[in-house]
Amino acid sequence: MKIKPVVIAANSSLLCFFSTSYCLAQSTPSEFAQMSLQELFNQSIYDTEIQQGQASPWTLNYQYKTAKFEGYLDGTKSLSFNDVKGPPSNGSGKTFPVVPTTITQTAHIYSLGYQFNDQWQGHLSVPYIKQSTDHLSLVPGYSTFTIKTDGIGDAVMSASYALNSESWLLSLGISLPTGSIDEKGDTPRGPGNQQVPYTMQLGSGTYDFPVELSYQNSSAPNLSLKASATIRTGTNDRDYRLGNNYSLSGRYKVDLSSRLKGYVGLAGQYSDSIHGQDDSLLAGDPATLYPAS
């Protein structure tokens, strides 16, 4: 069963560029706020000039992302909230006593880059994340409720190397666990604030390693390909680890005229399941994972 998303992404540059994307289910805030290493290499919204008309090696990048998830799918079939909300379904996964209805994610991603030479470039990226999730519930006193979290996410340090006249680009990085995994909110599990689900935490809590290999030819028509992965290590202080992420994408662009360009692209992404569990999210007798996790 998947939540249906409505996703909008905007990249700010000297000019403003808007793009739309589609995904099948909500990602965790730390996954949502990740910026493509190729985007970091290519983007520059602030590029100071030094003497002799040469560009400064320093760049300052900003990216704004927002996503909204609403509704449920069972395969390709749309489900109403009444179809999903109900007594625990004894493991069948069809009904839940607590149901997220609308999930809104926003990320402001700030990146500082330095061009060492024609082949090497380094970046430091820090996101600020906000998330709000509306719920319906069968629990008395919690027929409707909202959980909100916001703060700094996981910082990423990365290096990019141009392999062949910038046609091939290899990028490696390390994601630092600077985002909180201890966010709390008022949930039906009990009075007061409790630990909120994995999908509301701002960071992964582990040291992770993003890697990306991309290709882009400089001649027309233009073809670009990208393969990337985020490899996660160990377990965090809450005894779990987010799953590894893998993605493949390609884009074919052609100049239809001097002012008109067209392109077609295809992308796929796969995420492993979460390893381990945060026992503070367990509720009920026998104890089961909090449904909104």
Regions found by a protein language model. Name each.
Residues A25-P88, S167, T178-D182, Y198:
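Outer-membrane beta-barrel biogenesis signature
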Residues P127-R241:
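Outer-membrane pore/translocation modules
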Residues Q43-I45, P88-F96, V139-S143, N193-T199, ...:
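Extracytoplasmic loops and strand-loop junctions of Gram-negative outer membrane beta-barrel proteins
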Residues W58, Q119-L124, E166-L169, P221-L225, ...:
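Repeated loop/turn-to-beta-strand initiation elements of outer-membrane beta-barrel proteins
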Residues I50, Y62, Y110-Y114, L124, ...:
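Residues on the lipid-exposed face of transmembrane beta-strands in outer-membrane beta-barrel proteins
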Residues D83-Q105, F116-V156:
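Surface-exposed loop and membrane-interface regions of Gram-negative outer-membrane beta-barrel proteins
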Residues L73-T95, N236-S293:
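Outer membrane beta-barrel transmembrane domains
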Residues F96-T106, K148-G153, Q201-D208, L242-N244, ...:
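Short sequence motifs at beta-strands and strand-loop junctions characteristic
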